Amino acid sequence: MKSVCMVALGTMLVIVCGSSLLSAQEYDFDENSRLNTNIAIPVVAPVNPTARFTNFGVGFTAGAGYNMSPRNAFVGEFMWNRLFPSNSAITPLRLALHSRSLKGYGNLLAFTGNYKFELRGKSLGTYFIGGGGFYYRSVTLSQEVVTGTAIACTPEWVFWGFVCSSGVVSSDQTLANTSSAAPGFNAGMGFTIKVGEPRYRLYFEARYHYAATTPANTQLIPITFGIRF
């Protein structure tokens, strides 16, 4: 529920910011407009150590910002990704419960401020983008897991938020979800293709994201497909 609320809050902030920028425009919506917006669907490719626990992810990205010049812009973005754990990340818990029905998933939310440098032609363009912000990651199990004794502490147990001591998982822990929030940064590049007036452009982007979440940091590369205005 908390993750759903944050997704809704992030989307609302993007809409409000975009509306404020829109109402403040003194220019027509041509190639020289001061407003920039984007909406897209990212497909996530995790990078180690995240790749050890997650196969892939998919989500939603929306942003709005201010064009300082034709090449330089500020972009505020909200990103949400649903992360799907690998079998190896959940197998130790299934073995401990003697249940193959146990499932899990993760949510990653990010609020970032970014600088974009763009080289735009009449039809094609390319850009570099990077910045920083706040990242929130949560992982949830389909049922509570109660730890017993003498369970070897592996990174998979730590990923789900369990505490270890002297090389074993501490006994009598009951856990169904855990979360971590941390600052982070991102950097990447993309390509644009003009598809309509006044300046709609499809964009394809790859951007590396890092956040110092615990117990394992978050590293991933969303491959994003969307439209910029």
Tell where the protein language model's regions lie, with residue ranges.
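Outer-membrane beta-barrel biogenesis signature
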Residues: 14-38
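Predominantly the C-terminal beta-signal and adjacent terminal strand-loop region
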Residues: 83-85, 177, 190-229
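Gram-negative (and chloroplast) outer-membrane scaffold detector with strong preference
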Residues: 25-27, 41-43, 58, 63-151, ...
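Bacterial N-terminal signal peptides that target proteins for export
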Residues: 1-9
